[in-house]
């Protein structure tokens, strides 16, 4: 049945934004079961995508990911294939793909059981780590005059910094300076480019910089993932040491060569090099990725107390007051900003809080998440138009105005999922987090890899007759090629959360999970996607509480049956159904029934379809829409996406807005009918003479939003 969900713009009180965290401690309430303890099983789209990703990861030549480092540090590059895409020798973002490659190797290793595959993945990580340490050690230069090793602060004194250039000729010269970079610098880009950001040099691949600290973050993240996920002590220890030394280089540079001053105008703030207020507020050039996240994580991993304190201090150096301070007050500072430049900064704020930072960091993350959910999302869970956050509540205006599929950058989905997972740790009883995680995972992330050969999306097309722009066959090709290499080997990372004596089932996936603290192995048996799942103890027994997510879309027929007895006589969608602490044994069978309910996910903004569907006008509010209607004798409409449970159902074969009309019966409750499926894919349905498939299955053009009739009327 179709149920109507009207997402009209609403005013949200500041107090709501300040609640979210269920305790005052920096420690999370729950943690996800480690990636190495959960396996997605069976034959389904999830395992097919995962296996395709692993085959691709193993097919890439590790030497291609080392070329730029060897070149930058004056080492022999013979035998190394030339890198490609954004890692090619003529780009200033080189190294970003190498960082994603290390993360993908580590994630695949943690989620893999096959000994031969694990050995192959491990050998590549060993090669990467050994080579990167060799490069880094070339910066360990003792200066007799200074009586110490050269440090980051010594590189490019201010007079020299003011004269530095960003041309390719200068770039090649700076590559010869590796002995002057300062102890610990590791990057495929010369240190000059981190320094040039202190001079507020703009984004320009020809004459200035791209995003040097973004690249540093990708490398730190890859090394930290190896250190965290790999059980080979020699490799993980070396990876951590490389990351620690680079993190301390960042601390040293920003501690002594930068400052923070928000007073005055932009011109006066830029009169002196190194004002972080301006550095991190620059478009692209000031993009730092998750530097704050990685440095905060490092601060919790290293053994030396002084190093830990410095790394956390360095994390705070990446605060962006222009972006953070309004969010901390509950004000929307999102619109008009580059989406994937800023989502990772918010992830960093939350990790800073977890590492011991102030409560404001938690509030920044929570407020940002709430704003995005209420004001900027598409039905798929993605955000953005041409990589930007546009004005709030204007998704349809942006979608319709876009002439190409420049919507919903895949990196944004990757990072919003990460932020959601991290927030869920602090308030795991709030089902909104895993409802959203399910939405973006099932609709965008799973569908962002071509099902029969490895290629992943950059933008993820949403709109009228929209086709996913397939490409990105390696993590070097683009930012989304990098996150795409990681996405499909970690579907299970947020399936289960645990505390001392409670397990939260956040996702219904065919899986096996080991909860070592309780000495039990849980088995979840279901199809994917699932309308019914059975959870059993495969090994062990124990006393604990189990909480099962009741999805927001489970408005009819939801039930929980323990050993055949129904427990859910009452339930609330978007909540957790709790089975209080009891002794669980291998004889128990827990069945979750959650029939998919069709509903309309309405877009928040009104649009007017003009004659012959050749143009659209967008009204900012109901009054303006009414005036527009009266002047043109037209009715404003609210577009909507047809949902079946958590799945966006995309319409096949619609080419224009005249065809993109979905009529609901007078009672508003028609049901999808199973349709003949010539492609042999499950989940093909018909409604109102149109054919719909789950969007994750789409590999040709489909339409996501339709003109819903029997809905909005202005009176």
Regions inferred by a protein language model and the residue ranges of each:
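C-terminal beta-rich recognition modules with glycine/proline-rich loops and embedded aromatic residues
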Residues: 365, 434-443, 448, 452-536, ...
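Aromatic (Trp/Tyr) and acidic
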Residues: 22-115, 153-177, 191-231, 275-278, ...
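Helix-terminus loop motifs that line ligand-binding clefts
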Residues: 116-201, 376-387
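Intrinsic disorder/low-complexity segments
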Residues: 2-11, 17-20, 564, 586, ...
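C-terminal beta-strand-rich structural cap/linker in extracellular carbohydrate-active enzymes
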Residues: 544-547, 579-595
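Solvent-exposed beta-strand/loop surfaces of large extracellular or lumenal domains
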Residues: 555-580, 600-606
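Hydrophobic, small-residue-rich alpha-helical packing segments that form membrane-like cores
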Residues: 241-355
């Amino acid at each position: 049945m179709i149920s109507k969900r009207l997402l009209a713009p609403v005013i949200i009180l500041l107090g709501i934004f300040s609640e979210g965290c269920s305790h005052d401690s920096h420690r999370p309430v729950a943690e996800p079961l480690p990636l190495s303890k959960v396996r997605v099983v069976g034959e389904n789209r999830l395992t097919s995508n995962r296996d395709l990703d692993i085959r691709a990861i193993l097919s890439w030549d590790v030497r291609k990911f080392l070329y730029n480092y060897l070149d930058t540090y004056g080492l022999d590059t013979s035998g190394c294939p030339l890198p490609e895409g954004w890692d090619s020798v003529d780009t200033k973002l080189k190294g970003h793909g190498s960082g994603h490659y290390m993360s993908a190797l580590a994630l695949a290793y943690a989620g893999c059981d096959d000994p031969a595959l694990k050995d192959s993945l491990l050998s590549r990580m060993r090669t990467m780590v050994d080579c990167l340490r060799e490069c880094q050690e070339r910066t360990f230069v003792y200066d007799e005059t200074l009586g110490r090793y050269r440090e980051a602060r010594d590189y490019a004194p201010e007079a020299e910094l003011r004269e530095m250039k960003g041309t390719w000729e200068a770039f090649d010269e700076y590559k010869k300076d590796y002995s002057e970079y300062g102890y610990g610098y590791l990057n495929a880009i010369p240190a000059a480019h981190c320094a040039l950001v202190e001079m507020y040099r703009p984004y320009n691949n020809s004459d200035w910089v791209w995003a040097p600290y973004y690249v540093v973050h990708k490398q730190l993240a890859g090394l930290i993932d190896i250190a965290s996920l790999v059980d080979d002590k020699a490799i993980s220890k070396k990876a951590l040491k490389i990351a620690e030394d680079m993190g301390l280089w960042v601390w040293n540079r920003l501690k002594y060569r930068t400052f923070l001053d928000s007073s005055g105008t932009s011109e006066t703030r830029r009169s002196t090099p190194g004002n972080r207020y301006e550095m991190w507020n620059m478009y692209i050039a000031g993009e730092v990725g998750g530097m704050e996240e990685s440095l905060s994580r490092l601060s919790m991993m290293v053994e030396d107390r002084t190093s830990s304190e410095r790394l956390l201090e360095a994390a705070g150096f990446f605060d962006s007051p222009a972006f953070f301070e309004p969010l901390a007050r509950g004000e929307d500072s999102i619109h008009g900003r580059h989406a994937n430049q800023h989502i990772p900064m918010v992830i960093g704020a939350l990790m800073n809080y977890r590492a011991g930072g102030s409560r404001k960091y938690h509030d920044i993350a929570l407020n940002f998440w709430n704003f995005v959910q209420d004001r900027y999302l598409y039905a798929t869970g993605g955000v953005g138009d041409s990589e930007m956050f546009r004005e709030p509540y204007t998704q349809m205006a942006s979608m319709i105005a876009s002439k190409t599929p420049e919507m919903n950058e895949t990196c944004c989905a990757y990072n919003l999922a990460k932020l959601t997972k991290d927030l869920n740790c602090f308030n795991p009883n709030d089902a909104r987090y895993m409802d959203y995680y399910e939405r973006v995972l099932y609709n965008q992330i799973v569908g962002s890899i071509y099902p029969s050969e490895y290629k992943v999306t950059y933008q993820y097309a949403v709109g009228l007759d929209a086709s996913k722009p397939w490409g990105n066959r390696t993590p070097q090709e683009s930012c989304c090629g990098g996150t795409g290499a990681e996405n499909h080997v970690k579907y299970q990372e947020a399936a289960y959360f645990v505390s001392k004596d409670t397990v939260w089932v956040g996702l219904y996936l065919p899986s096996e999970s080991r909860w070592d603290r309780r000495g039990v192995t849980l088995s979840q048996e279901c199809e994917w996607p699932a309308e019914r799942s059975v959870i059993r103890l495969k090994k062990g027994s124990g006393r604990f509480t189990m909480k099962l997510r009741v999805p927001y879309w489970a408005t009819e027929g939801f039930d929980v049956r323990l050993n055949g007895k129904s427990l859910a006589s009452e339930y609330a969608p978007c909540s957790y159904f709790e089975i209080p602490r009891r002794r669980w044994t291998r004889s128990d069978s827990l069945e979750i029934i959650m029939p998919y309910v069709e509903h309309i996910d309405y877009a928040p903004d009104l649009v007017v379809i003009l004659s012959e569907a050749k143009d659209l006008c967008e009204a900012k509010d109901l009054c303006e829409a009414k005036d527009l209607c009266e002047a043109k004798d037209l009715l404003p409409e609210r577009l909507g996406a047809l949902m079946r449970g958590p799945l966006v159902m995309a319409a096949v074969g619609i080419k224009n807005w005249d065809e993109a009309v979905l009529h609901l019966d007078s009672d508003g409750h028609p049901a999808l009918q199973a349709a003949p499926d010539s492609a042999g894919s499950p989940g093909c349905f018909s409604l109102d003479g149109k054919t719909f498939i789950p969007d994750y299955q789409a590999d040709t053009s489909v339409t996501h939003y339709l003109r819903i009739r029997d809905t909005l009327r202005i009176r």
